[in-house]
């Protein structure tokens, strides 16, 4: 009887110990940037996505609101947090300033067509900025629609999903309706998420 009890205890202990070891070996994501910097970028991405959704839905009110919030978020980016790497810091300043300039232009336009032209430039410069700083909070897709402008010129945007949710043709296009909502595909993928394979 004692032998059976010892055998059961041994099996239970080994199983529990294996589970602990498996948990310790589970990969975790480690950012190369400070928490302050990452936290200051979170509202930038959130408001950019909200603006993208506004364009998808042909909702200029939502676009305008998100653009104003994005402007506020951009002004609050703690860019000096990456100043220790001079090359990255100096290279990031140009795209960051360009985003602000293009966003101001977008907010000043009266038609959604013109706003989309500025949105395209905002997206291009945001992509350049995130690629320069090696944004590592999430995986991003730089999407491209080949017929965003007049059915012949491309337009780009950033997305967390690989599937296209097209902000240029959207759900209420005068010619296509919502049939071209999925038009587009990733032109590039930003994935700088670092993985530490040993959890301490």
Model region roles, listed by residue range:
Residues 1-200:
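Intrinsically disordered, low-complexity terminal tails/loops enriched in metal-binding residues
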């Amino acid at each position: 009887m004692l032998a059976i009890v010892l055998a059961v205890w041994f099996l239970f202990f080994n199983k529990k110990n294996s589970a602990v070891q498996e948990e310790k070996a589970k990969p975790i994501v480690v950012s190369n940037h400070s928490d302050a910097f990452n936290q200051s970028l979170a509202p930038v991405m959130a408001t950019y996505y909200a603006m993208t959704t506004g364009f998808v839905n042909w909702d200029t009110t939502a676009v305008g609101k998100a653009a104003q919030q994005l402007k506020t978020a951009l002004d609050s980016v703690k860019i000096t947090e990456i100043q220790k790497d001079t090359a990255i810091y100096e290279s990031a300043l140009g795209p960051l300033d360009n985003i602000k300039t293009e966003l101001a232009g977008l907010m000043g336009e009266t038609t959604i067509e013109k706003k989309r032209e500025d949105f395209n430039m905002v997206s291009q410069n945001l992509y350049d900025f995130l690629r320069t700083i090696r944004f590592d909070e999430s995986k991003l897709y730089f999407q491209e629609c080949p017929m965003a402008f007049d059915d012949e010129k491309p337009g780009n945007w950033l997305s967390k999903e690989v599937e296209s949710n097209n902000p240029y043709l959207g759900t209420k296009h005068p010619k296509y309706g919502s049939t071209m909502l999925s038009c587009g595909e990733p032109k590039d993928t930003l994935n700088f998420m670092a993985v530490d394979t040993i959890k301490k």
